Amino acid sequence: MNAKKTLSMTLAAAMAAGLLAGCGGSSSTAASSTSTSTESKAESTAASTEATTDAAGKVYYLNFKPEQDEAWQNLAKKYTEETGVPVTVVTAASGQYETTLMSEMEKSEAPTLFQVNGPVGLANWKDYCLDLSGSDVYGQLTSDSFALKDGDAVTSIAYVIETYGIIYNKELLTAAGYTQDDIKGFDDLKKVADDIQARKAELGVDGAFTSAGMDGSSDWRFKTHLANLPIYYEYKADGIGSTDAIKGTYLDNYKKIWDLYITDSTCDPKLLASKTGNDAVAEFVGKKAVFYQNGTWAYSDVKDLGDDNLGMLPIYIGAEGEENQGLCTGSENFWCVNNTSSDEDIQATLDFLNWCVTSDEGTSAMADDMGFVIPFKAAKDSTNPLIAIANDYVAEGKTSVDWCFSTMPSEEWKNGVGSALTAYAAGTGSWDDVVTAFVDGWARNARLKQARQEDRKGGSAGMPRP
């Protein structure tokens, strides 16, 4: 079965169940990068869909994904060359999107195109979202399940489907005497990782797992993506899709996998506070670690190992039935058009979006340069081999893990969990502190979120607060 279609159906089912959430992040910690395309109009013979050029406005896209910044800059330039419409792409630094968005939206030249990470993010920004009902880009979606709505209004649409798990180096795993078939659950993973760690000098590695960096370029992998697993299993057990009071039923399992990550690692756990996403990439690509938790978006970082040398495992945490678990698949990337922009800029932005998802240039860039699976009718199959691996799990009947982290109450909650994980790893905090940050912090932030929403309903809404 086609990877694009398979993963699209997987995400559609997840969204229909109300369990959709997000991905993100990058190893980049640089300041925001800006590029504006202002070249004169030129004809394009490669486009399968002719771009609309009636709009007199301009486009300003505040991009969430640093790892795709260069590809978006190039695509913006191509669009300007074809249409003459100026397109500016600004990419927020890793972990700074919400803060950057609030700052940019207060400017006279605010973004005409921005994004939210799912229902929680939408709750903050829905008053700024143009109703996309009847727009060309909305009509290009393969399923209505890829849209977020506020009542009947289509406030945002998903533009990429992504998958994450534990990426591994096949060559190194084989050299250690194992294959993917030897790892069917947490106990197997721990046995293999412990053995690799014990034999690291013999195998020529520094550890089984790359460093679990907890600086801002990497901590999202653990305070958000790894934390998704205990949330997913709790929601699944309780038959719910969100909650204002997480119980922490599977936090002992969260501890198991975190302990494994920081013990069978390339570095002392006390050093994790300063370890970065780039450190983990260097360790993995440098063949100093066998396992690396990340997702399909990281392909460009690890492709030098060779497509045939890359594998991906589910993130096992010791939950019952996890032998049938697949990878974590979903989206946290939803386009929103700023309804406070001028009519000309709104039309220019809608035209640009439609061109991105229908033209040969746009769909090729998103599939090949960005490595995306996109939920649009004209989508091209991605050449990203990690996506093919994700498709194999689905074809084998494995159950994909829903992205439940869009239901996390706030960025403040994530930061609290991240700080507690870091202190625990360093030996300056206890696991009870992690549980407190996870459970009590969830309830506290859920109350704050509700109070802010009530304030907005009462007419005191200003710029959203994080």
List each language-model region with its residue ranges.
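Hinge/lid segment of periplasmic solute-binding proteins
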Residues: 47-53, 117-168, 221, 225, ...
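Extracytoplasmic "Venus flytrap"/periplasmic binding protein-like
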Residues: 78-143, 155, 171-177, 184, ...
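Extracytoplasmic/periplasmic substrate-recognition and gating elements
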Residues: 82, 176, 304-369
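A structural signal for short loop-to-beta-strand junctions that line the ligand-binding cleft
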Residues: 104, 111-112, 138-173, 207, ...
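Short, solvent-exposed loop/beta-turn-alpha elements that line the ligand-binding surface or hinge
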Residues: 131-145, 208-209, 213-216, 231-256, ...
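Extracytoplasmic/periplasmic solute-binding protein
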Residues: 155-159, 164, 190-243, 289
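Conserved C-terminal helix/tail region of periplasmic/extracytoplasmic solute-binding proteins
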Residues: 174, 198, 361, 378-382, ...
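Glycine-centered hinge/linker elements that transmit conformational signals in sensory
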Residues: 193-194, 240-274
